[in-house]
Amino acid sequence: MDSTTTPPSLRSNTRSALRLARNNKTLVKSHIPSLDLVLLSPKNNNGTPYPSPVSLSSPSSPVTLREILLLSPSPLRKSRTRLSNRFDMEAAEAAVTARRSKTKGGQNGLLASPSPRNFRRSRLRSEAMVDTKENTEPIVVVTDEKKQNQRKQKKLGRSKKEKHSSVPLLASPSPSSDQPQDVCQGDLERIRENISDLIMWRDVAKSTLWFGFGCICFLSTCFAAKGFNFSVFSAISYLGLLFLGVSFLSNTLRQRVTEEARRELKLSEDDVLRIARRMLPITNLAISKTSELFSGEPAMTLKVAPFVLMGAEYGYLITLWRLCAFGFFLSFTIPKLYSCYASQLNQKVECAQRRFVEAWGVCTHKKFVAGSAVTAFWNLTSLKTRFIAVFIIVVVIRYRRQNLQLDSEDEEEKKQQEKTHPEQQKSPEDKSTSPRSAEEEQALVLVAETKAPKKLY
């Protein structure tokens, strides 16, 4: 018979037959049939059942061994997925073997039938591939579980990070406590800048508006309140009377008769803390300024002492209203005038000091003049003024001594610099002398050139 290729369905049956032949050598003693010559359909039309081993051992069995081997299932029970994978692999290998047979036997025009060895090799390869797939499947599942665990851990990590990030935001009161102080300091600086702009007349329109409004208010009160004597106690009494009348009117209009409906005004700790935070920068500024004024330095003492003395001597004439009026007018006039005429005033003061020193140096009877001045002051003044005069003289002496010490220290530093760097100081002097000499020579040449034509004429 001509050799023809077997379909894939028969290949699987031949494999199962070979497997049974290996396992049942004791039962099967008949001759091994040739698989290449006989071809039978995989389906049994007669519907004969599977025979028993006893009937197989008998030689006169109606069913041939070929049919039994083809119809017998495989002894190994495999899963459906494994069988489907095996059939797919076998179909793919059958296509590959068909292509190989076509390439080899294409010249003769015949299809070569595969040998049993090729079936065995393909079967071993398919089983090896299925085993590797089965071995790799749990690994894939593990990796998937790891990925899922990693994703869960990432989500948990993110939630923990969000919790950690949200906790300090909720439990960090330090920035909130620092914010009111910064706001108050910013408000104070803004108020200070606005006041300095008004006093120094940087914005002329705004300064003139405020100055005119203040002048009208103070002048109107001076003319209208001639017989009015101001006192703090009377002012508080008038304010209390006004508040009492307003509260009575509000009570009658709203008809609040019952005590239960009345509102109780109480201050809480938050209110006190809020007020303290608002007042803290102002109090710190006042304390710092007072500490600067009363620091005890000679220069600052000489500046503050005259104002304190005037307040002590003429304090009974100064009232709150007059103080506000004088402060208003002086604040709008003195700073601007001093900034404009500061250089001229300093020159005049220096000239007066120079003249006094020259007159004192020219005077021949210095001791007599000094003694007469001291005795006249001592006899014409009171004990209080004597004490104040002695205090001021001591402050002046200390101020003078401090200035002398500073001048001596500056001179010593200059001498040390001259000793340490004599060459560096000489070199710029030499450089400065050389251009001066060149300039002088050029000036002399120009003068000579200008004078020469005059002599000719």
Swiss-Prot record:
Residues crossing the lipid bilayer are 208-228, 230-250, 314-334, 377-397
Transmembrane as UniProt keyword: yes
Biased composition of type Basic residues is found at 149-163
Q: Where is the composition biased (Low complexity)?
A: 166-183
Q: Where in the cell is it found?
A: Endoplasmic reticulum membrane
Q: Residues in domain Reticulon?
A: 195-385
Q: Which domain of life is it from?
A: Eukaryota
Per UniProt, the ranges with Basic and acidic residues bias are 124-136, 413-439
GO annotation, cellular component aspect: endoplasmic reticulum membrane
Ranges where the record places region Disordered: 94-183, 407-457
**Quick check: keyword Cytoplasm in the entry?**
no
Recorded hits in InterPro entries, A to Z, give: Reticulon, RTNLB17/18/21
Q: What membrane topology does the UniProt entry give? A: Multi-pass membrane protein
Name of this protein: Reticulon-like protein B18
